Amino acid sequence: MKRLYMMMAALVVCITLCAQQYQELWIIGTAVPGGAQKLTKVSDNDFKYAGRLKAGELRVATAKKAGKRTTYLVADAPDANIVNKGIGYTVTTDAKQAAWQVVVTEDRYRFHIDTEKKQLRGELFQPWGELFLAGGATEVGWKSEGHMLLMKQDLNNPCIWTWEGELKRHPEVEEPGSFKFQGQDRWHPKSIHPYAADTDILKDQRFHTGGDDTKWTLSVDGRYRIKVDLFNETIQAELVK
C-alpha cells in the first residue's frame, strides 16, 4: 500500500512538472538591443517579441542573467534563423548550443514561442496595405466580400489602423454580434483573431495573426472607435456614444 501511495505521488509530481508553464522568458546576446530583453507573455503557452534586432546571435533563456538553474531553448535545426515558418526546440543548460541567428539589422522583427508545441516561429514584419472590418455586428454583414469596411492607415506609422462607426447586433443574420478584421476585401488569406472565441472588443487588447477563426463580439451596441496595431498585435476599442 505504501509503495502504491509513493507511485501515485510520483505520478502527480510528474504531471505537475509536465504541465508547468514558464513564468518568463528572455532573449540575450549580441543581436538584442541592450543585451537583454524580456519577452511578452501573451498567454500561458505564448511568448512574443516585437521590435528591433541587430545582426548577430541571440539565446532564449529562462533568466536575464545566466545561473546554475538557467535553461535555454535550443533550435532543433543547426544555425537556425530567427526568421522561420516554425522550428522546434529542446531545452538545454548549455548556452553554447543555444544560439539563434539574426542575419540583418531591422526594426520590425517579430517572433512567437509556443511552449506547448515547443516551437519558435518568426518573421520580419511587413506593414499591410489594407485592413477591413466585417461581420454580423457591422452594416455589411457576413456576405461582404468586395464591400467590407475599410480602416484608415496612420500616416506616421503604417502598422496602425483606425476606424470609427456603428457596431450593433443584427438579429436577422448568423452570429449577429460578431465581427472580424481582414487584410484584404475578402475572407482569405490574411486575418487577425482574438485568442478566445467571442472575446468582448472592450475587454481584451490581445490578438494573433492568422490561426483559429475566432471572432470578436459586442457587449454593448453603439458607436465605436477602434485602433489596431498590426505589428504589436494589440487592439484598442472605446464607445464614443
Residue ranges and their predicted role:
Residues 21-57, 63-88, 125-173, 184-207:
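Aromatic-rich carbohydrate-binding modules that target alpha-glucans
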Residues 48-50, 110-112, 132, 164, ...:
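Residues within well-ordered beta-strands of beta-sheet-rich folds
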Residues 56-58, 107-109, 175-177, 224:
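Exposed beta-strand face motif in extracellular beta-rich ectodomains
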Residues 68-113, 188-228, 232:
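Structured interaction patches on ligand/partner-binding surfaces of diverse proteins
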Residues 106-126:
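Short, structured interface segments
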Residues 232-241:
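Short, low-complexity, Pro/Ser/Thr/Gly-rich segments in the mature regions of secreted, periplasmic
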